């Protein structure tokens, strides 16, 4: 899985649920402190630092060339798509969830030569939503580890800065003094935001 944001972290969890043996999260140096530990908590078996490691070589070592049949690309970076295709076995699939806006500067001829597929995914139908809620309700999908910050609206700059420097994954803003949950439960005892049993 390329990309350490919420989409990538959810993809790791779906891979775990589907029974993947090796689930590799690929990120950058700035992901090592916060996002890699969360990836391991939610189901990644390995994390690869693309800032320091040869991603294709390392993922191939971990999984074995013949087992790299599915890569989920959530970053939108062209280099991630290139590396995804390079490591992918013949007849494998890259699911492209991340959005990139720069033109590709590499050949994709080997998707024809080796019968590889790139599948774009963006839309969600009612079936997807129902399945997502079912997985959340059952506890199979973990959301809480991704909520790294809870801040009052007066600290919005701090929240945006944390997102920009990747020290946060998801930031939840609440009303400052008037917030019902904070007034009732206190800042440190905010109730579960995803309680689907009510």
Go through the PLM ranges and name each one.
Residues 86-103, 117-121:
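ADP-ribose/adenylate-binding Rossmann-like module
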Residues 10, 38, 53-54, 66, ...:
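C-terminal hydrophobic helical "lid"/dimerization subdomain
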Residues 62-70:
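A glycine-rich helix->loop->beta "capping" turn
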Residues 1-53, 57:
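Mid-domain Rossmann-like dinucleotide-binding core that forms the NAD(H)/NADP(H) cofactor-binding site
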Residues 69-72, 95:
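N-terminal Rossmann-like NAD(P) cofactor-binding module of classical short-chain dehydrogenase/reductase
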Residues 78, 97-116, 127-134:
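Rossmann-fold NAD(P)-binding glycine/threonine-rich loop
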Residues 27-32, 100, 124, 177:
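Residues in the short beta-alpha loop(s) of Rossmann-like NAD(P)-binding domains
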